[in-house]
């Protein structure tokens, strides 16, 4: 009886720990946002991102949230733009989001991990 209870608890814990969306590895760069493809104005201090053109064009991603994880930490960004030069697994984020998750802007382009939230 006790071993069955432990199995049920472990199964539930594992299911809760699994991310709802798969994680994606991609190249992370930064840009200076303005009026993006989603028609809103944003600045360097906003936690925003542009996703690759192919991904952006495949659905309605404006205002969706992404959790970006890098060497410096994690940040939640909002999709506000389309990145013409990005592959579908890459992100172009505001300078503030880049610094919070990836590190100094001088790094330029780094690999990061992200998923939809």
Predicted regions and their residues:
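Secreted/periplasmic proteins
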Residues: 2-117
């Amino acid at each position: 009886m006790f071993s069955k209870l432990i199995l049920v608890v472990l199964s539930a814990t594992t299911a809760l720990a699994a991310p709802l969306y798969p994680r994606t590895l991609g190249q992370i760069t930064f840009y200076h946002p303005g009026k993006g493809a989603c028609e809103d104005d944003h600045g360097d201090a906003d936690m925003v991102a542009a996703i690759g053109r192919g991904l952006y064009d495949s659905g309605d991603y404006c205002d969706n949230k992404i959790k970006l994880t890098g060497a410096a930490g994690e940040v939640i960004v909002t999709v506000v733009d389309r990145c013409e030069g990005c592959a579908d697994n890459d992100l172009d984020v505001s300078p503030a989001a880049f610094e919070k998750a990836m590190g100094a802007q001088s790094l330029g382009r780094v690999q990061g991990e992200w998923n939809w939230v």
